[in-house]
Design a protein with these regions (language model features):
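C-terminal catalytic lobe of FAD-dependent flavoproteins
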Residues: 23, 58-62, 120, 125-174, ...
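Short, flexible loop/turn elements at secondary-structure junctions
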Residues: 50-52, 80-86, 94-96, 106, ...
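Amphipathic terminal alpha-helices
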Residues: 301, 393-440
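Helix-loop-beta segment of a Rossmann-like dinucleotide-binding subdomain
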Residues: 22, 32-71, 101-102, 177-185, ...
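Dinucleotide-binding Rossmann-like beta1-alpha1 core, especially the glycine-rich loop
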Residues: 1-34, 163
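Short arginine-rich
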Residues: 41-42, 280-283, 424-430
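Flavin (primarily FAD) binding-site architecture
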Residues: 109-124
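Helical element adjacent to the flavin cofactor pocket in flavoenzyme catalytic cores
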Residues: 46-106, 198, 267
């Protein structure tokens, strides 16, 4: 009954600008026919429609890139450390060790689970964040992925927690835990969480086999939830807020902290904060971002007919196979166009142990997408690592391409490869092999 009420409310609140079909509620017999692998212990099921972000790390990059394009006087100081805040000057150290200072009129602290640490570094200790750890695993299970048929199963585990499983680039993404944590620098999916996910899958889908050998990648992060005295993590508000720390005698600028929030609401939250900043400066909004396309979403073909026309047009222009154009459009959106044009003028060579990722596209990313470290390419601009497609061989090939484009010497290239291997093992429980867990 609660699920039915919840789905009805979901439809009600989305009725004004509806773009998705209404929910359907399925009794046990119908639900088990639609999902034959699901446990017969279910009482009923519901179907509702939602959106998903297929490459959140890349979306972050595109937001930064679009911001730079919209405001030519802005700068993206990536991998820069806040080291001081004195006499109204905020000091930073860049990735090359160079130090510089900024005298801000206002600071927006969007550091997520690090918000309190940033506030302290700015001279104002706070306790705004009471984060919880959420872990996920990626499982190579073709039978499960096929049975999902593009759907996500959102279910209650045996202990009452809410979990989910859905198709992510041909793997089954399983999550998530909700464990109090305040250490974002050392978060990882631990053995207990992994066992919990496997046990939950076995309970939900008893006809299928699951074990640790099927896991190709894990990841974990801290939700920047507000500090709370709630007795259970699930009772902590998922709403967002933007508290203001007003200036004082030692800090002449205000700090606006972005507490809470998630991908579901990031555009609305950003709009609210931008309006708050404009109001403080006595200015009014000149441009609405509500319907502004982001990155590769600009001029993206809106339906299958438009998509086919786009692919045909640029396959003809570049003389590349339509399948290649389709692959890059799916991977990068309309940002694929300059990559396609570059491939058109070169001999296209695929990376070792891959079928669809070219040396040309990696070189283009290195030159054009604010790459500082090798990990930017394999963990953030592409999905090579999370897809299980990264190997010792293609990592070395990518490192050579990036080194050539960015002017690294052999010592720097070796350090970057080592750093990627350390991060993969420490944060993602991955030790690279000569062959991919999943070929791309």
């Amino acid at each position: 009954v609660l699920i039915k009420i919840g789905l009805a409310l979901y439809d009600y609140f989305g009725a004004r600008e509806r773009v998705m079909p209404r929910h359907r509620f399925l009794l046990k017999e119908t639900a088990t026919k639609e999902m034959p692998y699901i446990t017969p212990a279910i009482v009923a099921g519901g179907i509702y429609h939602d959106a998903k972000v297929s490459q959140p790390e890349r979306l972050v990059y595109e937001l930064v890139s679009d911001g730079l394009r919209a405001s030519p006087k802005s700068a993206a100081a990536n991998f820069t450390t806040l080291i001081s805040a004195e006499n109204g000057v905020v000091g930073f150290e860049g990735p090359d060790g160079a130090k510089f200072g900024v005298r801000p009129k206002l600071v927006i602290n969007a550091a997520g689970p690090w918000i309190d640490r940033v506030n302290a570094a700015l001279g104002k200790p706070t306790k705004m964040i009471g984060g919880t750890k959420g872990s996920h695993i990626l499982v190579d299970h073709p039978e499960l992925v096929k049975s999902l048929n593009g759907r996500m199963i959102y279910f209650e585990a045996d202990d009452g927690r809410i979990c989910l499983v859905y198709d992510y680039h041909g793997l089954a993404l399983v999550g998530s835990t909700d464990i109090p944590s305040d250490d974002p620098d050392n978060v990882r999916c631990d053995d207990h969480e992994t066992d919990y996910f496997i046990d939950s899958l076995r309970s939900l889908l008893p006809k299928l086999k699951f074990d640790r050998s099927q896991i190709v990648y894990t990841y974990s992060g801290i939700r920047p939830l507000p500090a709370s005295n709630a007795s259970e993590p699930g009772l902590i508000s998922r709403d967002h807020s933007a508290p203001v720390i007003e200036p004082d005698s030692e800090r002449p600028f205000p700090i606006i902290a972005l507490v809470g929030g998630k991908w579901t609401t990031f555009r609305g939250f950003a709009e609210e904060v931008a309006d708050k900043v404009l109001t403080r400066f006595g200015k009014t909004r000149q441009v609405s971002t509500r319907n502004l396309a982001i990155g590769g979403g600009r001029d993206y073909p809106a339906d299958d007919r438009a998509r086919k026309a786009w692919v045909t047009k640029y396959a003809t222009e570049t003389r590349l196979p339509a399948a290649r154009v389709e692959t890059l459009l799916k991977r990068y959106g309309t940002t694929a166009l300059p990559i396609l044009r570059e491939e058109a003028g070169a001999s296209v060579t695929m990376l070792p142990e891959t079928e669809t990722i070219s040396a040309t596209e990696i070189a283009w990313i290195a030159r054009n997408e604010l790459v500082v470290h090798l990990a930017d390419v394999v963990l953030r601009r592409t999905t090579l690592a999370i897809d299980g497609a990264l190997t010792t061989g293609n990592l070395a090939a990518i490192a050579s391409i990036v080194a050539r484009e960015l002017g690294w010497d052999d010592a720097r290239k070796a350090r970057e490869i080592e750093a990627v291997n350390i991060e993969l093992e420490k944060r993602h429980n991955v030790i690279l092999q000569a062959h991919p867990a999943k070929r791309r």
